Amino acid sequence: MIVKKMVWMTVRNKIIARPWMTPRSLRLEVNTMSKTVAGLIQHCKDKLGTPYVYGAKGEVLTQTILDRLARENPGTYTSTYKAKAVKYIGQHCTDCSGLISWFTGHIRGSYNYHDTATERMSIDHLDETMVGWALWKPGHIGVYIGDGWCIEAKGIDYGTKKSRVSATP
């Protein structure tokens, strides 16, 4: 069973995670209260251009935080990666799951969003009724904003950007 993508939707004012996978489904709420799909989409649009730093969840990056993230993720934080990340000290930073966690208030990695899925199906089913759903694949997550586009915190060389879903394999 290979998980390809993930989506979000609202059900009675609750945000529900839905990783897309065939043919099984699993239901589990991710967040409740006043968080809406419209709010998630607006949040993502507002964060376009935000620097990507692996492990960041929307906080202002400091040297202390960067050092902690490097200790926690030594495989990612090579000397080259750290040299790129240090440029973002003093700015709000995020990684892919942090973009969503920043909005929901639930700090999670992309796999945690997968684990809290409500339903799974193939990305082939993506359509315009799914605006605001989060697209998931192993190790990465983004938010579908319609017309074949998503917003994703893509990587340290890209930051948070609008991408064609078809260009995000």
Regions picked out by a protein language model, each given a short descriptive name:
Residues 2-6, 12-32:
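Short, Lys/Arg-enriched N-terminal segments with co-localized hydrophobic residues
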Residues 143-168:
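Catalytic Cys-His active-site segments of thiol-dependent hydrolases/isopeptidases
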Residues 22-97, 101-106, 138-139, 151-157:
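N-terminal capping segments
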